[in-house]
């Protein structure tokens, strides 16, 4: 697909609203939103609130996920392909199964040698994000100001960063850009935590998730759609695994050059897609949100990232024209940081697994290229305000403010530091 067509697709995606009362209504309007963390980035859905009189933007701090990518690991493509191929060789495929095998083969071949790599659409997403940054906050990026950009060591993140920076330079060649990807910075850019990981991967949480999946996912109809011998299926196919991988494959197509050319959504009913999404959605909430099943502490995995945001902001506030600090990483950082800050209420505890879907929407938190932007404003008296954008839309915080969605920097900083005191490990 050429650049002109990519730009057209991206503009259409930006025009799609993402506000509806329920996930089912969202999915009915746009089936690709059922794709959990594979959802292709939509961009801002709302107009920005004008700044209070006398305040102008002067600094931006950011953390963003890489853009749309191919799926990770050979099994993501091989399990559906070889399961269907074996059935074909043994005469166990239906006509629909034959059709699906041909589609899966095409999808697998497109991804060959591109394990987890950034797609062309993923690159375009980051060009669009930085373009809008500069258009929305021109004062921050004017003249020969400084841009400090860092990425994790993963190539899709590095390429996301480079695409964003190239767009910036096209719009302002005077920018002074520092960019890096080093293990030196991974303690906050991509922090590991054995204690939190142990809670996330314990037997108890897996049992809860398995019980939830057994209650909500039924693969019987799908298996009959693909295979002509139920007894053979029981002996040869891991039905739940095949269902999950076909759902993920169907979801991932929207971020590749096969979008609009091939689809696997016809394999699922609307209810089956919703149930698959429920299962993915609850996994994200329990793994990275404020869940009693994982100790109510998973958001603290981003404690070092939040400290870095605060410390660099304090340093930049002292400068006349500080520019921007950009960070490029993963959904596994943006999501818990969103919860740690309790943006839009996503940091609230959810005790009942059955209520997660009414309070937590992974496709609004964790799409490809999801990002948090902290935009700083000040007036002539040097009073500093900050507002937070989630996926480029203004987010709310549980902080009292006379100018919301703008918050006084002193209040925001105190709120964050108090949060960080709550974690003792």
Task: Give the location of each predicted region.
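Bacterial Sec-dependent N-terminal signal peptides
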Residues: 1-23
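Signature for phosphate-centric chemistry
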Residues: 21-148, 152-325, 329-425
């Amino acid at each position: 697909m050429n650049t002109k067509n990519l730009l057209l697709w991206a503009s259409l995606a930006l025009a799609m609203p993402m506000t509806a009362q329920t996930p089912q209504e969202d999915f009915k309007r746009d089936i690709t939103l059922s794709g959990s963390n594979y959802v292709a980035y939509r961009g801002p859905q709302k107009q920005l609130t004008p700044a209070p009189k006398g305040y102008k933007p002067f600094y931006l701090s950011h953390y963003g996920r890489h853009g749309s990518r191919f799926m990770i690991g050979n099994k993501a493509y091989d399990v559906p392909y070889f399961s269907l191929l074996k059935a074909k060789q043994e005469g166990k495929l239906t006509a629909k199964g034959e059709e699906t095998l041909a589609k899966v083969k095409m999808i697998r071949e497109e991804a060959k040698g591109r394990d987890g790599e950034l797609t062309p659409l993923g690159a375009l997403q980051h060009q669009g994000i930085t373009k809008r940054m500069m258009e929305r906050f021109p004062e921050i990026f004017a003249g020969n100001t400084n841009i400090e950009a860092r990425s994790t060591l993963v190539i899709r993140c590095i390429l996301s960063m480079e695409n964003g920076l190239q767009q910036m330079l096209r719009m302002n060649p005077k920018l002074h850009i520092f960019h890096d990807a080093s293990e030196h910075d991974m303690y906050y850019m991509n922090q590991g935590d054995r204690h939190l990981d142990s809670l996330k991967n314990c037997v108890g949480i897996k049992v809860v998730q398995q019980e939830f999946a057994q209650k909500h996912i039924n693969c019987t109809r799908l298996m009959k759609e693909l295979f002509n011998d139920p007894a053979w299926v029981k002996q040869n196919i891991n039905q739940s695994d095949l269902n999950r991988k076909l759902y993920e494959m169907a979801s991932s197509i929207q971020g590749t050059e096969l979008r609009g050319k091939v689809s696997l959504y016809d394999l699922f009913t609307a209810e089956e897609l919703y149930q698959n999404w429920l299962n993915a959605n609850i996994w994200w909430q329990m793994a990275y949100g404020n869940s009693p099943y994982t100790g109510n502490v998973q958001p603290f995995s981003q404690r070092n990232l939040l400290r870095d945001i605060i410390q660099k902001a304090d340093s930049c506030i002292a400068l006349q024209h500080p520019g921007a600090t950009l960070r490029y990483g993963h959904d596994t950082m943006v999501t818990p940081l969103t919860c740690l800050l309790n943006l839009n209420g996503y940091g609230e505890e959810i005790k009942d697994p059955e209520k997660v879907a009414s309070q937590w929407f992974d496709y609004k938190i964790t799409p490809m290229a999801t990002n948090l932007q902290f935009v700083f404003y000040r007036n002539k008296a040097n009073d500093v305000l900050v507002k937070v954008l989630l996926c480029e839309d203004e987010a709310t915080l549980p902080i009292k403010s006379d100018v919301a969605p703008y918050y006084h920097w002193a209040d925001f900083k105190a709120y964050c530091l108090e949060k960080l005191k709550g974690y003792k490990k």
